[in-house]
Amino acid sequence: MTNRLKEKYTNEVVPALTEQFNYTSIMAVPKVDKIVINMGVGDAVNNSKNLDKAVAELALISGQKPLITKAKKSVAAFRLREGMPIGAKVTLRGERMFEFLDKLVTVSLPRVRDFHGVSNKAFDGRGNYTLGVKEQLIFPEINYDDVDKVRGMDIVIVTTANTDEESRELLAKLGMPFAK
């Protein structure tokens, strides 16, 4: 079973982008390479159980086991030592990536309160898009009653596009709701 968004990419987005940007080969058409979801858990310094909850929630959202990130440097002001676990991240590729992107665009983002579209200024100059989510409750897998603390996350969509314009068109054609 192929993913709905992957089929849309192959059948609609590739021909449209080829025509719009005059690519000579379909291999030159930008595609979504990977999606990285990062959740920084600052309060894991005091209580490591908070990190376990965040890891469990991230696993539910992404469908795969997160990698626990550790502090690179010691910072006395935050009572943080080098090597302490302070977050979790997941890198999605292939089928899971398309499933997550589909779910994000069609289900999760419309559930955000007062949602008027995502910013179209969050591109990094190399065709990658970064999106901040303030609460994990927008994802349908998260049960509202099981949440002990509202946590946000960063979602980075890495594309093979060379420019922000190409990347913006790719994501818009895949259904990303950019603010007008």
From Swiss-Prot:
Keywords: Ribonucleoprotein, Ribosomal protein, RNA-binding, rRNA-binding, tRNA-binding. PROSITE patterns: RIBOSOMAL_L5. GO terms for molecular function: rRNA binding; structural constituent of ribosome; tRNA binding. This is one of the proteins that bind and probably mediate the attachment of the 5S RNA into the large ribosomal subunit, where it forms part of the central protuberance. In the 70S ribosome it contacts protein S13 of the 30S subunit (bridge B1b), connecting the 2 subunits; this bridge is implicated in subunit movement. Contacts the P site tRNA; the 5S rRNA and some of its associated proteins might help stabilize positioning of ribosome-bound tRNAs. NCBIfam families: PRK00010.1. Part of the 50S ribosomal subunit; part of the 5S rRNA/L5/L18/L25 subcomplex. Contacts the 5S rRNA and the P site tRNA. Forms a bridge to the 30S subunit in the 70S ribosome. This is Large ribosomal subunit protein uL5. The gene is rplE.
